[in-house]
Amino acid sequence: MRGLLIWFLIWVCGPAWSAHAYAQFGDIRYPAGFAHFDYVNPAAPKGGEISLVPPTRLSNFDKYNPFTLKGSAPPGLTGLVFETLLTGTFDEPTTAYGLLAEDVTVAPDRLSAVFRLNPSARFTNGDPVLAADVKHSFDRLTSKEAAPQYRTIFGEVQGVAVLGERSVRFDFKRVNAELPLIAGSLPVFSRKWGLVNGPAGQILKPLDQIVTDTPIGSGPYRIGKVNFGRDISYERDPGYWAKDLNVRRGLFNFDRITYKIYKDNTAQLEAFKAGEFDYIQAFIAREWARAYTGKPFDNGQLIKKELKHGNAGDFQGFQFNLRREKFKDARVREAIGLAMDFEWLNRQLFYNAYTRVRGYFVASDFEARGKPGADELALLEPLRGQLPPEVFTADVPLPPVTSLDPASGITLRDNLRRARGLLAEAGWTYRDGALRNAKGEPFTIEFLDNSGSMGRVVTPFAKNLEKLGIAVNTKVIDFAILQKRMDVFDFEVISSRTVGSEAPGTELLERFGSRAADTEGSSNLMGIRNPAVDALLDKVISAQTRPELVARVRALDRVLRFGHYVVPHWYGGVHRVAWRAGRFEQPAVTPRYYQPESWITSVWWATQANRDGLRRNAGDSSVGAK
């Protein structure tokens, strides 16, 4: 779910909670009064700096407000400047601990949760964080002034009531074990953010008109030096209210965190080798094998490592826009998928570094397998009239495999033959030099890309599609333009990646729900409008135990895979990262569930040489204060 780093699970059934934390399923790992998380160094020195590039490349940013649809906010802003009522950990996926809220109480009927705010909590302007700020944040984020995904995320919250100066109650529309976590993930900002002088006194701007107003959050960092479109620095707040709190002890150790923006992957890597920044994550196997080489790596100036993790695999694939008529037929989508030769790509381009994505819940317990068992059938049977018969009788679809053995029956030629048959069934036949429908219209596909790196994959894919008579056009556009087109669903086929989750829940409404298909800025890029999917989503978010959640998500995965909404890509089992030697240290314990960027910026710390260098550069400034 969004807004919380909620990772590992203790395997028992049913919701549990206590004053200092809430667990959706199972036990709470850290008891009341715990000293610090196991994976941090509580004595880590403060100081020094780290500079990096965002894992999702931005070509520009033009605002300081991450909560609205229009424009692009800088990387790092949400997690460094704003805070939530509860905070997750890197070693539990469905448990969160008090941050802005010092305790949480869930009602016996589980239809509400009361959060009592920490009296020490302060915004960066010195004001206390009060219940009125929490309600204000909720009301603004669920209004039409905010990006529409927040209305989906908090859609099961009936409302927020102020009970006292530092006490606030979230009322829920129904029993849902995840809802206290969702309420706890609310980003809280000051009621004074966006306050300006007007003719008759101070007025508050609508949230979508707060653009470059300095954020008033409660997080450990403030915005420092900014070059719009190039880089942004965050400076550690020496007076940060939670620096001695157990959920923050040993965290956020750098005095300065700088994100740099480059036009493409090549420019990023060359700048890294030249010493312009400290840390980078690689997502392209070919670049990792061939470009992360040379003198700086050979002489130890730069370190490259493949870091193990226990995360669920990320979902990635070419997503069809079902809002376009030509992609509405599942047989057409399946036929296009048959033209992608993953085995060739893995041999020739990926150095055999990847495994094929099979479903939407990659390398996890939630991935459907084989034929449905009794638990899934109990969920699917009431939907029989809305589902293809093979959902009940056939193995769940797997991506096509391409063999080099002519006798295998699954060579590329065989797969393309099957594709032609599916296209013909759907009314598309080859004539006059192209694949055409009954009206004589040719079948064309436009792939959008923002970096050009996907071109090496699309090119052989396009050659295979051309054998079917499909004309392919690949268009490389700026990230900001791509983001705008994605927000309004102005594309045909696009490559998209979603970070895997150890506890899928309400965020799936954003990815697959019918309502989100018509909501600009939603994650339902495919435009899925399927009543059976909606019914299963409803079951998923109402799961009360871990076994219930597993069965319900598997049933959802099965139905989605029979829809052939994507051409699945691939995933790797490690994080590929590189950094400058001699600048950083890290704890001996590595958490099992983490994303490298957030782990490194929050848990690592600077070496003495790094800290001394920043102090020399800062002179007598407050940067580096303890």
List each model region and its residues:
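Aromatic- and charge-enriched surface segment that lines or borders ligand/interaction sites
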Residues: 40-45, 68-76, 103-147, 163, ...
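Detector for C-terminal structural segments
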Residues: 54-56, 227-232, 236, 338-402, ...
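Aromatic-rich, solvent-exposed beta-strand/loop patch
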Residues: 98-105, 124, 129, 153, ...
